[in-house]
């Protein structure tokens, strides 16, 4: 670089200040100095900028946002960030990515040239400070997609407004308002029509607000479920960040099962294969490498291998971005239970429509035959009655009939499901479970079998090497120095090169940081801290030729390396001890000698493995061989280097959770890749197996044994199996299929890519949030955020709570429907009028549908729910217990209201208006008291745990206050009159009798045979086969 001293400004500046120059000369000298300085600076820039973006420059010059300065102490990295404009055309790079233009990449200097232009150091990543990340986000955009705007409140108002019954009521309100004003004047004539308007408006607003709120809730949960974690390299450290925080220039680590978070280029890795079917539709897996195909695209998934990727496009600049931006995720997913309730709503609505039609016909006939009176006079006197009066009366009759339909249709049922699901999903998040599919909430309550993994679910997944055997000799921590240097060097190779983990050693020389899977971290920690491995040195001395990543089918991983010092090629295998042992013909001793693996030696080593496994240790073996060629990983004739035992303790509370599931009638089956001895030890520790079990031999099988059964044997033995060891994902899938064929509702936990088929096949797929791959999560219904089996038990409890809450509301609402329909129908037939006006019925509909749903759908789960047996696939949605409760309460309400209708005036010595108000008030208060009964369908104490549900208490209080306002202050609006204290006391007393009636009702025994099966053709929706609701599409 040109020396700055070459540009000497001192003489120039001195000449500018000399007194001999006149004013004009000084101005010319200043102009010359300015031009000269600019030329000098441009010359410097031309030399400095290429030096900074040259891909062949040193690490210091590649340090993107930092300036390398020379000082007396040598080159140092300045900590001050440097604003820069990328030395690359971003739009051109996006087009190159979209077209997979390899010559275009090469023209930019290859992947390394692109990295240099983006100021990325491939070995250190970008700088992780907020200023640097924000600058890159401003320059290249954020890793988010522009979604179509969510549905607003007006959309839901419009949806509610489109309801046919609402439209008919509005038409009736318009006619009623017009004729009322014409007949009685605007001061008195607007009340009836205006009241219907206000009531309809309230129904629309409340319905729209409820749906809008739930839409927002589901959108929020959807954003959370899309916020996956990505591992990146920043400031030389591997760290996990949100996918939304990935920026251009980031170095991203990819492994099997990961979803690629942005468009990028392959930096380094091995055996990388990508599934691009989500983007191209092609099912074939594509191999990605540095030379021929370095292109990696957002949204695609890694199916094999591992790699590091340089991010070059994010968000809307990615190939997938434009496609995703046009997709609006539908949060209005209909669950199977909602579909069943829609059918139930439709059927009850038809019954209500029939009753309303009969009421309409009867009232019209009675009116036009002169059998109705108003203020003691006949309403219709043929041609003497004004047309306006006739039309107004007909409109009033039609409005009453339509309102009966409104009350009869249990529109609150789907709302109750939505409220319950939204409430449960929100609460389950705090209980470490994220729901991805709504149907899983209700289905989980019916689970009869849970197939669970061991590692990380039943155990802590915090591995630590506690045993090490070299050949037939146990090596303790204090005796590792006795290991031969040659064997030690091979162990360094076997752990340091055959791994997907990494070791980060800071400049300060503090304790190294280990990253990777728990197993990899444990092995690296043991090799570095106990055996003294320098991982960076090991990597520099060897060249990795080929890698075979860990496979759950083979249960091992391998690497082919060339030692640079002597150019020899070595094969290293690592994996399940008995699998690796089967590949060995010799073994190393601590002195470095190699002994023959005869039958006696193999038996002794197998006994060592079984002994460690019986102590709940996970056994990993290392084997080595000098290879004859550099293209194939040989799998036989290896030499066993050593066996380590990793301790992974059970999670606290797992045994209690297992016991809870057993009491709930749910069978736990542990499916693991560990050997049978380790699996049994953990199963006993967790309580899955009991030492008193007589059928212990049938309870434990190996995967190969299970898959080799005949179909008949599998179906016969599958119920008895509690533990399946050395299993593959295909064995897990096979077990799930067998269990479902036997009628079980199956929940399955999984974390690997290969678990995806089993997760999809199961009725409920539960993926692990920490160790789970993105492929597994996408295949699942619920993500267990803490990977803890205790959270699985909590999900089971929530599932039962959802189903139970919906049944409570069905019982409550059908009671109101039956009572309202019968009382209006009988009164219309016999007296020619309906005791409850359109506005009053709309008010009942409002408190019943919305407030009732809120009160009953938000009950929290109790431990009592887990003392019941699971709900069967074919069990009726409306049980005999529910029929008993709702029929008794309905009959009581009908009896009370009919007595008030026909004898109320004489019993209480009141006029008709007071009697009608008593009927309306008593009917509403009956629903308030019956809400308490609905809290418990079988238990006699309906007040237990009431203090924990403040929302229920609040809604009851609000309902009572609003009812008082309706009766006492909105007389014109609600067509009521004021009641005195004695009359209020009578209404409360009559309504409160529903409590003792509900208490004694629960002593009435019920048959186990479904109630409607006694009829010749029971409606299928009530009997309700649950198979469609549980079977995956």
UniProtKB/Swiss-Prot annotation:
It comes from Arabidopsis thaliana (Mouse-ear cress). It catalyses: Ca(2+)(in) + ATP + H2O = Ca(2+)(out) + ADP + phosphate + H(+). It comes from the Eukaryota. The gene is ACA12. The N-terminus contains an autoinhibitory calmodulin-binding domain, which binds calmodulin in a calcium-dependent fashion. The chain crosses the membrane at residues 153-173, 192-212, 342-361, 398-415, 807-825, 837-857, 878-900, 910-930, 949-970, 981-1002. Mg(2+) binds at residues 751, 755. GO terms for cellular component: membrane. Activated by calmodulin. The active site is at 453 (4-aspartylphosphate intermediate). This is Calcium-transporting ATPase 12, plasma membrane-type.
């Amino acid at each position: 670089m040109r020396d700055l001293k070459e540009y000497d400004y001192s003489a120039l500046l001195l000449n500018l200040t000399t007194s001999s120059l006149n004013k004009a000369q000084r101005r010319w000298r200043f102009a010359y100095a300015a031009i000269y300085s600019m030329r000098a600076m441009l010359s410097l820039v031309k030399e400095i900028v290429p030096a900074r973006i040259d891909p062949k420059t040193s690490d210091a010059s590649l340090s993107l946002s930092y300036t390398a300065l020379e000082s007396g102490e040598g080159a140092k990295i300045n900590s001050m960030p440097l604003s820069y404009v990328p030395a690359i055309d971003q739009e051109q790079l996006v087009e190159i990515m979209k077209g997979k233009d390899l010559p275009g990449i090469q023209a930019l200097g290859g992947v390394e040239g692109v990295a240099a232009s983006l100021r990325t150091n491939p070995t250190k990543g970008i700088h992780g400070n907020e200023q640097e990340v924000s600058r890159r986000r401003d320059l290249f955009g954020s890793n988010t997609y522009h979604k179509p705007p969510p549905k607003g409140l007006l959309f839901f108002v419009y949806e509610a407004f489109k309801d046919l019954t609402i439209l008919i009521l509005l038409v009736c309100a318009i006619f009623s308002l017009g004729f009322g004003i014409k007949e009685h004047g605007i001061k008195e004539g607007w009340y009836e029509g205006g009241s219907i308007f206000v009531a309809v408006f309230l129904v629309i607003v409340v319905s729209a607000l409820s749906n809008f709120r739930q839409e927002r809730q589901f959108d929020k949960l959807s954003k959370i479920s899309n916020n996956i974690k990505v591992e990146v390299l920043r400031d030389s450290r591997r760290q996990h960040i949100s996918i939304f925080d990935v920026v251009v220039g980031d170095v991203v680590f990819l492994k099997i099962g990961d979803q690629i978070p942005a468009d990028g280029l392959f930096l380094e890795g091995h055996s990388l294969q990508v599934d691009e079917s989500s983007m191209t539709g092609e099912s074939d897996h594509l191999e990605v490498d540095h030379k021929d195909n370095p292109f990696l695209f957002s949204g695609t998934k890694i199916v094999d291998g591992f790699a590091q990727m340089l991010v070059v496009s994010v968000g809307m600049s990615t190939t997938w971005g434009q496609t995703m931006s046009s997709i609006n995720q539908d949060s209005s997913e209909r669950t199977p239970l909602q579909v069943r309730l829609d059918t139930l709503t439709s059927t009850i609505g038809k019954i209500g429509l029939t009753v309303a039609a009969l009421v309409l016909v009867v009232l019209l006939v009675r009116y036009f035959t002169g059998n109705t009176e108003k203020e003691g006079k006949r309403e219709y006197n043929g041609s003497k009655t004004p047309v306006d009066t006739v039309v107004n009366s007909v409109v009033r009759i039609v409005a009453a009939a339509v309102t009966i339909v409104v009350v009869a249709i249990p529109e609150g049922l789907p709302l109750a499901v939505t409220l319950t699901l939204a409430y449960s999903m929100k609460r389950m998040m705090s209980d470490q479970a994220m729901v991805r599919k709504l149907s899983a909430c209700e289905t989980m309550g019916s689970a009869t079998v849970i197939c669970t993994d061991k590692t990380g679910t039943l155990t802590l997944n915090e591995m630590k090497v506690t045993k090490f055997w070299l050949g037939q000799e146990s090596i303790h921590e204090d005796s590792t120095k006795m290991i031969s240097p040659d064997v030690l060097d091979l162990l360094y190779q076997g752990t340091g090169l055959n791994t997907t983990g990494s070791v980060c050693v800071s400049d300060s020389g503090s304790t190294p940081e280990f990253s990777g899977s728990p197993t990899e971290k444990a092995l690296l920690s043991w090799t570095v801290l106990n055996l003294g491995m320098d991982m960076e040195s090991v990597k520099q001395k060897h060249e990795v030729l080929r890698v075979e990543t860990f496979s759950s089918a083979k249960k091992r991983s391998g690497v082919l390396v060339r030692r640079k010092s002597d150019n020899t090629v070595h094969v290293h295998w690592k994996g399940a001890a008995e699998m690796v042992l089967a590949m060995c013909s010799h073994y190393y001793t601590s002195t470095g000698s190699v002994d023959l693996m005869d039958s006696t030696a193999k038996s002794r080593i197998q006994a060592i493995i079984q002994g460690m496994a019986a102590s709940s240790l996970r056994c990993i073996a290392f084997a080595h061989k000098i290879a004859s060629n550099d293209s194939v990983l040989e799998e036989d004739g290896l030499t066993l280097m050593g066996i380590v035992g990793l301790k992974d303790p059970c999670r606290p509370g797992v045994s209690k959770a297992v016991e809870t599931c057993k009491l709930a009638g749910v069978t736990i089956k542990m499916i693991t890749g560990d050997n049978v001895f380790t699996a049994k030890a953990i199963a006993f520790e967790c309580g899955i197996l009991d030492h008193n079990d007589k059928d212990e031999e049938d309870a434990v099988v190996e995967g190969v044994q299970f898959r080799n059964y005949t179909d008949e044997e599998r179906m016969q033995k599958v119920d008895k199996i509690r533990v399946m060891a050395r299993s593959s994902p295909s064995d897990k899938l096979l077990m799930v299929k067998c269990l479902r064929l036997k009628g079980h509702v199956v929940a399955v936990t999984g974390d690997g890519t290969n678990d995806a088929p089993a997760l999809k096949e199961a009725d409920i797929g539960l993926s692990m949030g920490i160790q789970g791959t993105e492929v597994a999560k996408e295949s699942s219904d619920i993500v267990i955020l803490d990977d803890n089996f205790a959270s699985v038990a909590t999900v089971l409890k929530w599932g039962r709570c959802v189903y139970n809450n919906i049944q409570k509301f069905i019982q409550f609402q059908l009671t109101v429907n039956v009572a309202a329909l019968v009382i209006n129908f009988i009164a219309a037939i016999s007296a020619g009028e309906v005791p409850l006006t359109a506005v009053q019925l709309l008010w009942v509909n409002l408190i019943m549908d919305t407030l009732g749903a809120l009160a009953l759908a938000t009950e929290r789960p109790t431990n009592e729910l887990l003392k019941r047996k699971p709900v069967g696939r074919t069990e009726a949605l409306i049980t005999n217990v529910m029929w008993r409760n709702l029929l008794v309460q309905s009959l009581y309400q009908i009896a009370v209201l009919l007595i008030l209708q026909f004898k109320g005036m004489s019993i209480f010595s009141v006029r008709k208006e007071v009697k009608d108000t008593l009927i309306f008030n008593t009917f509403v208060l009956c629903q308030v008291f019956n809400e308490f009964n609905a809290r418990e369908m079988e238990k006699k104490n309906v007040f237990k745990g009431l203090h924990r549900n403040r929302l229920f208490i609040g809604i009851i209080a609000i309902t009572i206050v609003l009812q008082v306002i309706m009766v006492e202050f909105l007389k014109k609006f609600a067509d009521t009159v004021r009641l005195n204290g004695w009359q209020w006391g009578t209404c409360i007393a009559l309504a409160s009798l529903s409590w003792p009636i509900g208490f004694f009702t629960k002593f009435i025994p019920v048959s186990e045979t479904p109630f409607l099966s006694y009829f010749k053709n029971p409606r299928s929706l009530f009997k309700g086969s649950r198979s469609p609701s549980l079977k995956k599409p």
